[in-house]
Amino acid sequence: KEAQFIIENKTTTVPREISLTKKEYKINKKLKEGIVLLNKIAKKLRQERITKGSILFNKKEVGFVLNKEKEPIGTKIKETKESNNLVEEYMLLANKEVAEIFSKKKNKKNVYRVHDLPNEEKLISLERIIKKLGYNYRFDNMNNMHKNINKLLLEISAAPEKNLIDTLVIRSMSKAKYNTKNIGHFGLSFKKYTHFTSPIRRYLDIIVHRNLQRILLGTTTKGDKTLEEKCFYLSEREDLATKAERSSIKFMQVKYMSSKINKQFVGTISGIMERGIFVEINKNKCEGFIKIKDLPNDYFVFKEKEYLMLGRHTKEEYRLGDEVLVKVGGVDEHKKRIDLLLIEKL
């Protein structure tokens, strides 16, 4: 039931302080019992969501270890804990339920978080690329598209090329955005979804709160004329924020690798284009670029259909997922670029 309440917090904790897989808890017994019960329900919600087709992306996020001067001296993989999943499930449930309330108000505009179907051409390209990596899946049927994507993500969960394929699948998806017209959320497999709550506070959440409050109080919704404009603007700002985040990560990668000039690393080919090859270093997940002119022992050409780099005389091939030994040739902090030199294909 929807209603206005005041929540009084009795304690404050964060997911990293709660280890749901261990017997030791840093919280009192009563709170522990409540969290364990909530977690049981969250697991059922999660399983139900997966059964209905929700896609579970689990791409590894990389963070940086900083010294006192805030300079990167190491990298670390951000761990997703069971307690993070607990919070996520109730957040998704709240967002879904508020969208359900909005959908019943047919004569009033409200805000939805929508995610369109994937681009057909990108899915065909994804099928072709993963087939060359040894995975045979089709994504041309809406009835089993969610299921096949999840099967692929599950199959690669322990594979060396996991991070690469995760990235390729994410790139094949449409961008989620805000809209007053509900078309559903493909990734979550929800017919109705909005952004009512999150670990961060977004302005869009506040718009949703105001609209929900007006519905609960029975007052007239104001500002409908500007709602579509706000949705478009906030979707644009979100894109800019995402680009800024990626740029900051790349900048930190370059700063970190600036102390690794002439050192050798094992990496995986993560991208191929006419100008050269992208390689993600396995150890620290930093990505660098090998210029096509720097590929040794032959003149190489990019074969777009096969998505590979081919030596004109030696017929040497470089494909996505190939492991290579590279040397850090240099960095450019201004251009946020790591230049790599190929030593050999492994």
Locate predicted features:
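Conserved, carboxylate-rich catalytic/transport cores that coordinate ions
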Residues: 1-346
